Curated annotation (Swiss-Prot):
Keywords: Cytoplasm, RNA-binding
GO CC terms, sorted: cytosol
Protein known as: SsrA-binding protein
Gene name tied to this protein: smpB
Chief place where the protein resides: cytoplasm
Cleavable signal peptide: none
Length: 159
């Protein structure tokens, strides 16, 4: 099953590559409009955000590319695994996202999918894609900071 931190969130799936491939500018929380068998599958902890993204079409935000497999015990009422799912946001948030995604090279990327008080939520990031050299710089910074903390630890121990 999934982990449940102290804030009441039960994380179902995370997009682990999102922070590597994108520079996160802003983060939003949105509800997800689901059918019954999708909720049952999510309660089992089965979902994938690997190729997922969100788009704004006709004043509505849609989550695309999220794979929620069919419910094992479902019948003919089962859902399509890769169907588009509507995200539930306030009108002001949608209007702001429309303006920001239209202006520049920004995209909407889901970071995680989780339960909050029994409702499925998605953590949606407004992000800009990273180039290969940006990724290399981030890795170099991370390695340098890791080396510094390691050296400080050695000095504190008196080695």
């Amino acid at each position: 099953m999934s982990k449940k931190p102290a804030d009441g969130r039960k994380v179902i799936a995370t997009n682990r590559k999102a922070r590597h491939n994108y520079s996160i500018i802003d983060v939003y929380e949105a509800g997800v409009q689901l059918v019954g068998t999708e909720v049952k599958t999510l309660r089992e902890g089965k979902a994938s955000l690997v190729d997922a993204f969100a788009t704004v079409d006709d004043g509505e935000v849609w989550l695309r590319g999220v794979h929620i497999p069919q419910y094992d015990h479902g019948t003919w009422t089962n859902h399509a695994p890769l169907r588009n799912r509507k995200l539930l946001l306030h009108r002001a948030q949608i209007d702001m996202l429309v303006g920001k995604t239209r202006d520049g090279n920004l995209t909407l990327v889901p970071l995680s999918l989780y339960f909050l008080d029994g409702k499925v939520k998605v953590e949606l990031a407004l992000a800009r894609g990273k180039q290969a050299h940006d990724k290399r710089q981030d890795i170099a910074k991370r390695d340098a900071s890791r080396e510094i903390t390691r050296e400080l630890g050695r000095r504190a121990k008196g080695m």
